[in-house]
Amino acid sequence: MTAPESPRRAIVVSAAWEATWPLVAEALHATWSATGSVAVVRADAQSWATVGEVVRTAGFDPSQVVHLASLGVPMAPGDLEYLPSLREVALSPRSGYGSGLTDDLAAAFAVEGIRHHAHVAEGFWGQSVAEYALALTLCGLRRIPQLHQAMQSDPRVWDYAPDGGDRAYSHRGAQFGDDDRFASGTVAGKRVRIVGAGNIASRYASFCVALGADVAAYDPYAAEPAFHRAGARREWHLDRLVADAEIFAPLVPLMPATRGLVTAAHVDALPHGCLVIWATRAGVTDTEAVRRRVLADEVSLAADVFDVEPVPAGDPLLGRANVVHTPHNAGRTRHANAEWARQLAAQFTDL
C-alpha cells in the first residue's frame, strides 16, 4: 500500500495492534480506497509515538486528511495541528478493545467539530463465534476430533461390531460409533438451551432451529425482538432452562453481571449426558462444577474457552473421550476482521 501525496483518508496502525486484529487495516483500506485516496502508515510495535508524530514524518501531506482511523496509535489534542482538515476519526487503543477516546481529546474534538466513531457492539465477530459454537456442537455430538485422532493409530476405530464389553459405550453397530452415554447424533430433535440472545447466541440459536432443534433461550438483558431473530422460545427462568437441556450453551459475554451467572446449582441440574458448549467465556458458568461433572462422566464438554488459559499440559480435561477442546480460536477470522472494518467504515460520511 503506497501513500498518495495528499490523501483524504488515513489509517495509522501499530504493529502491536495488528497482533490482535491482523487483517483490519487491509480490509479498511480496501473499503475506503474504493471511493478516494487513502494513506496507510504502520508504526513499530515498540513505538508510543502519537498520531501527529507519525503522520508528519510519513511521507505524505496530512493537511488534507478528512477521515482518520487510528488503530493502536495514541492520539493527543496537539496532534490536530497536523490534521487541520480532520472531520471524522475512529480510535482503537493498543489492546484492540474500547474507544481510545480520552476526556481531553473529546474536548478538543468538540471545539474543532470533529466526530468520533466507535463500535456500538461486538457484532463483528458474532458470525465467526456462532459458527464455531455450532461446529463444537457437531463435534461434541459425533466425536469427530476423537475419531480423527484414533484413526491415525488404532485400526479398531473401523470396527463397529458389538464390542463384548471392552468399551464403555452401551451400543455399537454398523457405522454407529457415537458414545450414547452422552448427547449424540443429530442436532435435529435435540433440546438446545441457550443462555444469551445477543450477537452470538441469537445466531447460534437460529442455526440450531434451522437444523430442527427445539431451542429455548434465557437472557435477562435482551429485548423481545432478539428472541424473534433467534427463532427461540423465550425462557424467563434459568432454573427451568437447564432442567431439560440436552445441549446447553451459555453464550453471553463475560462482564461483572454475568460472571458465574450459571451457578453450581444450575450446572448440577443439567440432565445426565448433557453436552455443554463453552464458546464465549467459560467464566459465565461455575467452572469448577462443570469440571466436576465432566470428570465424573456425567456430562460432556465441547470448549474453545476455559477457566485457565492456556490450559496447562496435564489438565485432566485434555484428551478425554467426553471432551472436545480447541485453543480459543473462534473469534478471529478473515470475516471477523473484514466486519470490524466494514461496520466501523459504515459510520463515516461519504467524501
Each predicted region: which residue ranges?
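Phosphate-coordination loops involved in phosphoryl transfer and adenosine-cofactor binding
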Residues: P7, A188-V192, G273
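Rossmann-fold dehydrogenase core element
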Residues: A107-G123, P271-L275, V290-D307, L318-A330
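N-terminal glycine-/charge-rich "phosphate-binding" loop or analogous flexible N-terminal tail
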Residues: M1-V73, A216
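C-terminal helix-to-coil terminal segments
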Residues: T2-R8, V12-T31, F124-S128, G140, ...
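Glycine-rich NAD(P)-binding loop of Rossmann-like domains
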Residues: L147-R203
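Phosphate/diphosphate ligand-binding glycine-rich loop within oxidoreductases
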Residues: S63-D166
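Rossmann-like adenosine-cofactor binding region
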Residues: A76, P220-P316
